[in-house]
Regions:
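Pre-P-loop entry segment of helicase/translocase ATPase cores
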Residues: 88-149
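C-terminal helicase module of SF1/SF2 nucleic-acid helicases/translocases
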Residues: 512, 517-612
């Protein structure tokens, strides 16, 4: 922070003015009781605008926040003059906040006339600054950017490796996608990879690319896509798991650029280690690959610029651009008045009294506080996001808000009715979302089908859903801004209180840039130390510590793990040890070189000690070396023990997986899970649960609708004399599909299948049955390559399976599936309404891509 910034921000009169603006802005957004609605003293806009003007050249967060606070406060004030509002617009111009200017003009068209009437040197200065804050695209088009976006573009254009960090609302996603689009539209062929932490973000990002690019550019999200090699220009939007699989399927795959979104996830356990591993493999294949990282609120983005690399052109940057003001508000019950809650704004390290609200009902349990407070403050307005600790709590919160809004009329909207129909068709007719949506209330958590979550997000952004209850999936990078965010005792996982860096990442969703001037974060029961062991205060940045670095920081522990036999992870053995061992063993077996590992800096003596330990155990492996690298995260020693067990059985052909359509599939997959649980690991305990999981896995691969799987489990429970609660049952089935069928089962069963196949080869046995691509069938929940092709071009699993009876060829390519969608007469098919709508919508997208191609 510069001396000028320090001097201006330390002015008592200026600080007091900022506090007045902040308190007034919250009061304007909240339905306070009558005693607290009297107008506050109007700030001295002339003085505040002058101070803010002096701060516009400053790049630090405090100065940026103050400039934005003054400008937006002035624009929202009913008592500021035309000249003052014009000056406020000029402030926004000087800091490159064009969306806020557009919003102000939309709300008050007279502002433009005020600027023209008050033309001065300030106007010329703002125009000069606006010209500075632009980027010229390869097409010659010019886009307006903010200071962070301008800096990113300059660094990415001049360096091979770049790592940036900025607040959630700084426009990272937009500028990075524009930069990638520019790379794809350049003069030379380009192959780009966008690594996203979740499948939800994969879908969101890939849709953006498809909407911006013509069909001469390949946009791929699946490693099984047979048309991957058919484009000179292509972008792959993948999770680290899918990129790893693509590496194994295409040994010569070498992208020119890899972008890692939400790069702080490199610190998250085994998935963080896998992210490090796929980056290491990409660099091993092509040392000249360009890497770009982006993370929110990271203090040390430079840690991702691997010091062991030979690249000299590197740059790290911590951006502090503020685009939307955020108000942190504490909400606590007024003593002896259970219906009344006091609000206090945290600003400048102090709590400022805002006023009181009254709830329609007194919460009879703690779990009703947040939804009732949200309903009291949000009313019929849009953009209300409510945080819940888990799927069950999310549905309960949504039910409470739904009940609190019982006097409000139902929302009459075709889009809402389509969501109702879709949720019943894709999940189950008893899924509660269908009921709540008609009153403008939705919920969203990780285990819900991807396409349904996307539709919920879309309706929330459009204001058709006024309230959305979400879990920590919001921390995974999904772009879902809001006007108000409500939360109490937020957790990360089932037990751990949410760390402050994660809280601020979540809080960054408050404030819809270009839609609202500010966002509000309402923290409930902050006086309860059990709910809030650490009260939120000033926004904090976190330090990134890659999981691989953390695990290998204790070399002795790793060597002891190897010498003890490198068994599967359990209560005594962290899974990070097993994952790191797999990575190191794969590197060692394939070339023996552990030098230059990406993301890990080891001393020569440490590298030698690990190599010696690996040298003691790897000669005992009869396992094919390629299987070690292929099955990331699984101990090679565990694979060897499985191989020994299959060889001891003597009949590997009898243990081979069968196609999911086989009549004996349930029993065969149960046997496979028995072997997996004993030798490889996974969440397949207790043994009594494995037949149920085998049935789930087989049904999922067969493409059985989720509703049928749910009804089958309900029927089984009734036959066992157990009661059935549909909300709970639906959540359990969706969790099993996501956690077991789509994540753990493909990881472990594909490894099992490969080991069994090797055993058969050793014994000279013929494998009579080909089960197909287990990983594809499990992750996508479909049995045929044709189904995969339909999904790869944009259809959901539900629609893909709905049309399966009309598409008999099991081996259609994506191009053939595209042609089918474009030519089919949906009115001639007996399809569910949601499936027919999706096909028509996809056809329109294809048409738009061809139109862009000219």
């Amino acid at each position: 922070m510069s001396q000028l910034s320090d001097r201006v921000l330390s002015l008592t009169r200026f600080r007091a003015g900022l506090e007045e603006i902040a308190v007034s802005s919250v009061r304007a957004d909240v339905p306070l009781l009558g005693d607290f609605t009297s107008p506050t003293r109007e700030p001295d806009w002339g003085f505040l605008l002058a101070c803010a003007s002096a701060l516009t050249p400053e790049s630090n967060e405090g100065a940026q926040e103050a400039v934005l606070r003054v400008a937006q406060g002035c624009l929202r004030s009913s008592q500021s003059t035309d000249e003052q509002r014009a000056a406020a617009i000029l402030l926004l111009d000087r800091v490159g906040n064009q969306p806020a200017i557009a919003l102000a003009r939309d709300r008050d068209e007279s502002i433009l006339a005020s600027i023209e009437a008050n033309s001065s040197a300030l106007v010329l200065d703002a125009l000069y600054r606006r010209a500075e804050l632009t980027v010229t695209l390869p097409s010659g088009d010019v886009i307006e950017v903010n200071p962070f976006q301008k800096k990113f573009w300059e660094l990415a254009s001049a360096n091979d490796w770049v790592s940036v960090s900025a607040p959630t609302s700084a426009g990272k996603s937009y500028i990075i996608r524009e930069w990638m689009l520019a790379e794809l539209r350049g003069a030379t062929p380009a192959r780009l990879v966008y690594i996203a932490p979740t499948r939800a973000l994969v879908e969101e990002v890939s849709e953006v690319f498809r909407s911006k690019l013509d069909d001469s550019v390949g946009v791929h999200t699946l490693p099984w896509d047979p048309e991957i090699t058919g484009f000179e220009r292509q972008v792959f939007v993948l999770t680290q798991e899918r990129l790893h699989l693509l590496h194994q399927r295409l040994p010569q795959f070498t992208p020119s650029v890899i972008f890692v979104d939400e790069a702080q996830k490199i610190a998250d356990g085994t998935r963080g280690i896998l992210l490090t591993q796929v980056l290491d493999e990409a660099i091993r294949r092509d040392p000249n690959v360009r890497l770009v990282f982006a993370s929110p609120l990271s203090a040390n983005p430079g840690v991702l610029l691997d010091s062991a690399s030979s690249h000299e052109c590197k740059a790290a940057f911590v951006g502090e651009t503020v685009t939307v003001n955020q108000n942190l508000v504490f909400v606590n019950q007024v003593p002896r008045k259970p219906l009344r809650y006091s609000l206090s704004l945290v600003y400048g390290g102090n709590e400022q009294d805002v006023g009181e609200i009254e709830l329609p009902l007194a919460p009879d349990v703690v779990g009703k506080k947040v939804p009732l407070i949200a309903a009291a403050i949000g009313g019929v307005s849009t953009g209300n996001l409510v945080f819940a600790n888990g799927p069950a709590e999310a549905e309960k919160f949504a039910r409470t808000i739904f009940d609190a809004l019982r006097d409000d009329p139902a929302i009459e909207s075709d889009a809402v009715e389509e969501l109702v129909d879709f949720s019943k068709g894709v999940v189950h007719e008893r899924f509660q979302l269908a009921e709540f949506a008609r009153r403008g209330v939705g919920f969203h958590y990780g285990d819900m089908p991807l396409v349904l979550k996307a539709k919920v997000e879309e309706l929330f952004k459009r204001g058709k859903l006024r309230y959305l209850v979400c879990t920590s999936t919001l921390l995974e990078g999904v772009n879902l801004p809001c006007r108000n965010l409500f939360l109490r005792a937020p957790r990360k996982g089932p037990r751990m209180h949410m760390p402050m860096p994660d809280f601020w990442n979540l809080a960054g969703r408050a404030g819809r840039w270009g839609t609202e001037f500010q966002g509000n974060i309402f923290c409930v029961d902050t006086s309860d130390v059990k709910a809030w062991p650490e009260k939120p205060g000033r926004r904090k940045r976190s330090s990134i510590m890659p999981a691989a670095t953390m695990t290998l920081s204790d070399i002795t522990r790793m060597i002891e793990y190897i010498d003890r036999g490198a068994h599967k992870a359990d209560r005594e053995t962290p899974p990070e040890l097993e994952s790191s061992f797999n990575w190191l063993a794969g590197r060692f077996i394939s070339g023996g070189d552990l030098a230059g590992l990406y993301g890990v800096t080891l001393r020569v003596d440490e590298t030698d000690r690990i190599a010696e330990a690996l040298g003691r155990v790897t000669p005992t492996l009869r396992l094919r070396p390629d299987l070690v690298k292929k099955h990331a995260g699984i101990s090679p020693m565990s694979m060897q023990r499985l191989l020994d067990a299959v060889l001891a059985n003597g009949q590997p052909e009898e243990l081979a997986l069968v196609p999911p359509t086989s009549d004996d599939a349930f029993e065969e997959y149960k046997t496979a899970l028995d072997y997996v649980a004993e030798y490889l690991g996974g969440s397949f305990e207790p043994e009594s649960r494995r037949l149920s999981l085998a049935r789930l896995i087989v049904h999922w691969m067969r493409g059985v609708p989720l509703s049928v799987i749910i009804d089958n489990r309900a029927r089984w429970r009734r036959n066992q004399g157990q009661e059935v609660s549909y909300p709970k049952l639906i959540r359990q089935v969706m969790a099993d599909v996501e956690d077991i069928a789509r994540f753990e089962a493909p990881r472990y069963l594909s490894c099992y299948a490969d080991v069994v196949a090797q055993a058969a080869g050793i014994l000279g046995r013929q494998m009579e049955v080909d089960a197909g691509d287990i990983e594809m069938m499990l992750e996508l929940g479909v049995p045929r390559p044709t189904d995969m092709s339909f999904i790869s071009v944009g259809l959901s699993r539900a629609t893909t399976r709905a049309i399966a009876e009309f598409v008999l060829d099991p081996f259609l390519s994506p191009a053939q599936c595209t042609a089918w969608i474009e030519n089919v007469d949906v009115e001639q098919l007996e399809l569910p309404a949601f499936a027919a709508r999706e096909i028509v919508a996809q056809r329109q997208l294809f048409s738009e891509r061809r139109w862009r191609a000219g």
